[in-house]
């Protein structure tokens, strides 16, 4: 037996010891705890708005904090800011590269960002004096595609990349403040905690990591998925996270218990998950799938309680408004739909 094989076995044994130690701390299962909870019942949501205007696949969307405006990015090379109440386009921003994979709305509403196969994160000022929207910064240091970006405030943004790293940027100087190293596969998705001090990342190494923005360190690593993690989000109280993977499951991990609580899967679901988001209370989990649907799960009982079907292609992105009143889904069919 080679030395590598020996080390591999040793690593597996150590991983098993960690898993056993975690299990020993779990004095009760989530299923036991929530057995007394009332059943959610069928969740039926209708399409209230369809946002038409993109001419190609939509890859990403993100709500503004006002729960009214949202930004979407498409392969047609446009970044569009929409008014979801009227379905009007507030801004249509032509991009230098049409290979866009992510977009983000700043909490202040002053900026939007996007990036993709150009390996850059481009920041656009929506409130410029001239009235036209233009690039205010191009953040380039990643050596792989930009998979996700999220603002912390008007001067700080976190990015994840196909180069396996995440980075915190100072937008004013255009420099990376911190590089977060630890994943062994492409970083696919990130989400920022409600207090903006932590963020989580999901990667193609099938693990999710919790990072401390201020210290620049990895706090926790969560494993259990059998394939790439494509999507990740925080539970509304910031004390748990949910991941969506190509293994056709979503998983809920508790940060304090340091382990997986529940797995959302069904034998009839065999395709990967592209996007995940919680309702305002956290009781419902929305997950977008490659089979053109968005499933609604009871996050406490891991039962499927609804389905949003209306797209003619893969649901690539989704988001719940800050006020919890609506869900938006974006798809490769070039449309965005607003549901409630």
Curated annotation (Swiss-Prot):
InterPro entries found in the cross-reference section: G-protein_beta_WD-40_rep, Gprotein_B, Guanine_nucleotide-bd_bsu, WD40/YVTN_repeat-like_dom_sf, WD40_repeat_CS, WD40_repeat_dom_sf, WD40_rpt
Superkingdom: Eukaryota
GO biological process annotation, one example: regulation of glucose metabolic process
WD repeats, residue ranges: 53-83, 95-125, 141-170, 182-212, 224-254, 268-298, 310-340
Alphabetically ordered keywords of this record: Congenital stationary night blindness, Disease variant, Repeat, Transducer, WD repeat
GO CC terms, sorted: cell body; cytoplasm; cytosol; dendrite; extracellular exosome; heterotrimeric G-protein complex; plasma membrane
GO molecular function terms listed in the Swiss-Prot or TrEMBL record: GTPase activity; GTPase binding; signaling receptor complex adaptor activity; spectrin binding
Keyword set includes Translocase: no
Implicated disorder: Night blindness, congenital stationary, 1H: A form of congenital stationary night blindness, a non-progressive retinal disorder characterized by impaired night vision or in dim light, with good vision only on bright days. CSNB1H patients present with childhood-onset night blindness and middle age-onset photophobia, but have near-normal vision and do not exhibit nystagmus or high myopia. CSNB1H inheritance is autosomal recessive.
Subunit structure: G proteins are composed of 3 units, alpha, beta and gamma. Interacts with RASD2.
Family designation: Belongs to the WD repeat G protein beta family.
Reported function: Guanine nucleotide-binding proteins (G proteins) are involved as a modulator or transducer in various transmembrane signaling systems. The beta and gamma chains are required for the GTPase activity, for replacement of GDP by GTP, and for G protein-effector interaction.
Protein name per UniProt: Guanine nucleotide-binding protein G(I)/G(S)/G(T) subunit beta-3
Organism listed in the record: Homo sapiens (Human)
